[in-house]
Amino acid sequence: MISLALAAETAEHGGEAASHGGLFADPAFWVSIAFLMVVGFVYIKAKNKILGALDGRGAAVKAKLDEARKLRDDAQALLAEYQRRQRDAMKEADEIIRHAKDEAARLRAKAEADLEASIRRREQQAVDRIAQAEAQALAQVRNEAVDVAVSAARSLMAGSLAKADQNRLIDAAIADLPGKLH
């Protein structure tokens, strides 16, 4: 826009400038040159500051992007770690459950075996007690039979045998008794 105004002014005063000493004698020319120099100077000075600010801002944005990328990578690594831990925990829980089931089955089998052994032991004890009771009953019956037989023999012999014969028969029966009881 300024160059259009300058061109228009130069065109207006162009005839005058040419007649009085040319382009270098025209104040508009020098104003335009001065203006361009100021703009160039400001551009050079401001360019470094603007570019520096833009570079700084770009570096800050890049740093933030790098940090965000690093945070994302860290978050993904952490997520992967927690997922791995969860899988490991699930495997461990499954292993614990399997072990508990195996242990329960083993304990149940042991309890059944112990119960069966206990039942067999009690049956054997009952059979032993019955056999012992039978043996005692048989021994009592034998003793009773012997006592009755001895008593009957004594009463029969007492009436029909002499005292010396009675004693001899009793001694013979007593000597014979151990062989007959077994």
Swiss-Prot record:
Keywords: ATP synthesis, CF(0), Hydrogen ion transport, Ion transport, Membrane, Transmembrane, Transmembrane helix, Transport. InterPro entries: ATP_synth_b/b'su_bac/chlpt (IPR002146), ATP_synthase_B_chain (IPR050059). Signal peptide: none annotated. One of its GO terms (molecular function) is proton-transporting ATP synthase activity, rotational mechanism. The chain crosses the membrane at residues 24-44. Residues 1-7 form a propeptide. It is a single-pass membrane protein. It is found in: Cellular chromatophore membrane. Belongs to the ATPase B chain family. F-type ATPases have 2 components, F(1) - the catalytic core - and F(0) - the membrane proton channel. F(1) has five subunits: alpha(3), beta(3), gamma(1), delta(1), epsilon(1). F(0) has four main subunits: a(1), b(1), b'(1) and c(10-14). The alpha and beta chains form an alternating ring which encloses part of the gamma chain. F(1) is attached to F(0) by a central stalk formed by the gamma and epsilon chains, while a peripheral stalk is formed by the delta, b and b' chains. F(1)F(0) ATP synthase produces ATP from ADP in the presence of a proton or sodium gradient. F-type ATPases consist of two structural domains, F(1) containing the extramembraneous catalytic core and F(0) containing the membrane proton channel, linked together by a central stalk and a peripheral stalk. During catalysis, ATP synthesis in the catalytic domain of F(1) is coupled via a rotary mechanism of the central stalk subunits to proton translocation. Component of the F(0) channel, it forms part of the peripheral stalk, linking F(1) to F(0). This is ATP synthase subunit b. It comes from Rhodospirillum rubrum. The lineage of its organism: Bacteria, Pseudomonadati, Pseudomonadota, Alphaproteobacteria, Rhodospirillales. The gene is atpF.
